[in-house]
Regions:
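Juxtamembrane transmembrane-helix termini
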Residues: 53, 85-92, 135, 182-192, ...
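Juxtamembrane loop-helix boundary motifs flanking transmembrane segments in multi-pass membrane proteins
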Residues: 29-44, 57, 61, 94-105, ...
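Hydrophobic alpha-helical transmembrane segments and adjacent short intramembrane/lumenal linkers
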Residues: 107-111, 120-212
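Low-complexity, Gly/Pro
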Residues: 1-16, 51, 88, 209, ...
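Hydrophobic alpha-helical transmembrane segments
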Residues: 7-23, 48, 54-55, 93-103, ...
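Membrane-helix interface segments in multi-pass membrane proteins
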Residues: 78-115, 162-173, 210-241
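N-terminal juxtamembrane cytosolic/stromal segments of multi-pass membrane proteins
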Residues: 2-74
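Selective transmembrane helix interface/packing segments
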Residues: 12, 16-19, 23-24, 28-31, ...
Length: 241
């Protein structure tokens, strides 16, 4: 009886590196990259646990890095859309005479690079913070950074919504956070409380960094960018305090 119980216990030990049937993105060679990307994003939004359990190659980041690059481009495009709307609104202000298209184009490209590239870098930062937190969980199996990178990247599918003006980005952010909790609970087999707390703390740390960057960017936009890009009827001067 004791031997049978021991064998049963050994059989139920969780192996975090177990391979699944393959995600749509991993099968993009047969599905086509565009269709595979959108199908992966939709599964991430509506069946995140199933998607994460189907990862075929948890030991390499080749597929997940390409997926992350495309996700980062989406956030860069979102920043471009919102920057364009902001500059268009500025051009409609009563005291505005002209908006320099060349300067505006440069600023828009700069914003795309900062948000897209920044998102790519911040994801890696999230994985490092998250890995340190779950390493402290009692009874949690050893998780490699590569595994965490691969699993959590498939939580980013709601980024498709980021290109929707105004409402899209906050909805995407909340949805991604929910997916990250699912990643910890369903794929990494953490207790729900641990999965929630670890994902939330890591996510808040990243949002804090992003908030600081956004604040600096907004100050730049208000006090410097518009100074060069927008010509008004009122003599333009940099503010003095």
């Amino acid at each position: 009886m004791k031997i049978a119980a021991l064998e049963k216990k050994q059989q139920t030990v969780f192996d975090p590196m177990v391979s699944g049937a393959g995600t749509p993105w991993e099968d993009r060679g047969t599905r086509g990259p565009v269709g595979a990307f959108f199908k992966t994003c939709f599964e991430s939004m509506f069946s995140p646990g199933k998607l994460m359990l189907s990862i075929r190659r948890p030991e390499t980041t080749t597929d997940s890095r390409i997926f992350l690059i495309i996700i980062s481009v989406l956030w860069g495009l979102s920043a471009l859309i919102h920057m364009g709307i902001t500059l268009w609104r500025a051009s409609q202000m009563p005291n505005v005479i002209d908006v320099d298209p060349i300067v505006c184009t440069v600023y828009c490209l700069l914003v795309v690079v900062l948000f897209g590239g920044g998102g790519y870098v911040l994801y890696s930062t999230y994985v490092k913070i998250y890995g340190r937190l779950i390493a402290q969980e009692k009874g949690a199996p050893l998780m490699t950074e590569v595994l965490l990178y691969n699993v959590n990247v498939y939580a980013l599918g709601p980024s498709l919504l980021a290109i929707i003006p105004f409402a899209g980005p906050p909805i995407a952010v909340i949805w991604i956070l929910c997916n990250l909790v699912v990643a910890g609970n369903v794929r990494l087999k953490l207790k729900f409380s641990a999965a929630f707390i670890d994902a939330l703390l890591s996510f808040l740390a990243i949002l804090g960094i992003m908030g600081g960057i956004f604040l600096l960017g907004w100050v730049f936009l208000q006090h410097i960018a518009f100074y060069y890009a927008v010509t008004t009827k009122i003599p333009t001067k940099l503010p003095h305090r």
